[in-house]
């Protein structure tokens, strides 16, 4: 309802602050242009509770990325204040933020996902790893400090860099096309195929503007149905709600591997979720409207 007061939460203090500011501005501009009573609030600092109590919004559009928007604290706060919001619950956010916990749940349910374990000093020293592998923080997003590692020397460097962001995981490397699917509650949108600027879809590839996106992805009808069903099942198994995105690798044997679930995806007009929606004829403003109207 357009007579409701909406707060767009963006910014914050995570390493993904700059990306979040862009998402928040795009969403806020869209809501205002559509006639919504919307204001933006930078979640940086310690004044968020006071700002929300002062504004008394009916709904919050969560455009925070990284720990600020995806570790469950913002969801818990909004739920405590009885404010409807566009992201997953506190419990689901905690699960999806931790890639290892997410992976363990998916593997328990026999969902296709690459094998992984925590990387430690001892494991680095053992030198018994079959390369290539992926090394990344177990929490975080935007592929910050994520590496494709091909040797023990590269492993040591990757471990050192990734450990700056907390616990580190090492994951089986899967070669194939990078595919993603956006979901808003029961609405599963078209898959998008990403051709990254670099060897894989790392931070630079995501924000340089030089990667190529195919939306729709060009999958045959059967494979499109399969990837959408896998995305929705993963979304449901991890307890997601609202807007989320599921990332896959599609190998040359026709197998999909679930890489991760993002509970607060980017929301600029060039972000992946809007591209997923646009492939089905849903423009950016309409997509923003669908997300906010379904806030829970």
From Swiss-Prot:
GO biological process terms held by the UniProt record: cell wall organization; peptidoglycan biosynthetic process; regulation of cell shape
One Pfam family recorded for the sequence: Dala_Dala_lig_C
Pathway(s) it belongs to: Cell wall biogenesis; peptidoglycan biosynthesis
EC number from the UniProt entry: 6.3.2.4
SUPFAM superfamilies: Glutathione synthetase ATP-binding domain-like, PreATP-grasp domain
Binding-site positions, Mg(2+) 1: 247, 260
Domain of life, per lineage: Bacteria
Binding site for ATP: 129-180
Known catalytic reactions: 2 D-alanine + ATP = D-alanyl-D-alanine + ADP + phosphate + H(+)
Cofactor(s) needed for function: Mg(2+); Mn(2+)
Record keyword Transmembrane present: no
Gene Ontology annotations for the cellular component aspect, listed alphabetically: cytoplasm
Record's subcellular location: Cytoplasm
The entry's keywords: ATP-binding, Cell shape, Cell wall biogenesis/degradation, Cytoplasm, Ligase, Magnesium, Manganese, Metal-binding, Nucleotide-binding, Peptidoglycan synthesis
Keyword Cytoplasm set for record: yes
Residue ranges of domain ATP-grasp in the record: 103-293
Binding site for Mg(2+) 2: 260, 262
Cofactor, free-text remark: Binds 2 magnesium or manganese ions per subunit.
Gene Ontology molecular function: ATP binding; D-alanine-D-alanine ligase activity; metal ion binding
Task performed by this protein: Cell wall formation.
Annotated family: Belongs to the D-alanine--D-alanine ligase family.
Listed NCBIfam families: D_ala_D_alaTIGR, PRK01372.1, PRK14569.1
The protein, known as: D-alanine--D-alanine ligase
Annotated organism of origin: Francisella tularensis subsp. novicida (strain U112)
Source species taxonomy: Bacteria, Pseudomonadati, Pseudomonadota, Gammaproteobacteria, Thiotrichales
């Amino acid at each position: 309802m357009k007579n409701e007061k909406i707060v767009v939460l963006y910014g914050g203090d995570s390493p993904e602050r700059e990306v979040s500011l862009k998402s928040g501005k795009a969403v806020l501009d869209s809501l205002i242009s559509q006639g919504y009573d919307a204001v933006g609030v930078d979640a940086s600092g310690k004044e968020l509770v006071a700002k929300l109590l002062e504004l008394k919004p009916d709904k919050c559009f969560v455009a925070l990325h990284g720990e600020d928007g995806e570790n469950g604290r913002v969801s818990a706060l909004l739920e405590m204040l009885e404010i409807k919001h566009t992201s997953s619950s506190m419990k689901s956010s905690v699960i999806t933020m931790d890639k290892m916990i997410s992976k363990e749940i998916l593997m328990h349910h026999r969902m296709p996902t690459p094998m992984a374990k925590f990387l430690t000093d001892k494991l680095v020293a053992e030198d018994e790893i079959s390369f290539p592998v992926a090394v990344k923080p177990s929490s975080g997003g935007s592929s910050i400090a994520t590496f494709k590692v091909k040797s023990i020397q590269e492993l040591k460097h990757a471990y050192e860099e990734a450990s700056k962001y907390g616990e580190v995981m090492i994951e089986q490397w899967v070669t194939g096309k990078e595919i993603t699917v956006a979901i808003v509650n029961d609405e599963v949108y078209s898959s998008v195929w990403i051709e990254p600027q670099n060897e894989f879809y790392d931070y630079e590839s995501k924000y340089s503007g030089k990667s190529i996106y195919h939306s729709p992805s060009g999958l045959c009808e059967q494979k499109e149905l399969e990837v959408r069903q896998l995305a929705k099942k993963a979304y449901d198994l991890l307890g997601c709600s609202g807007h989320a995105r599921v990332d896959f690798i599609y190998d040359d044997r026709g197998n999909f591997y679930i890489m991760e679930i993002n509970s607060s995806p980017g929301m600029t007009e060039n972000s992946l979720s809007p591209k997923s929606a646009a492939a089905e004829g849903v423009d950016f403003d309409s997509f923003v409207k669908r997300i906010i109207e379904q806030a829970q």
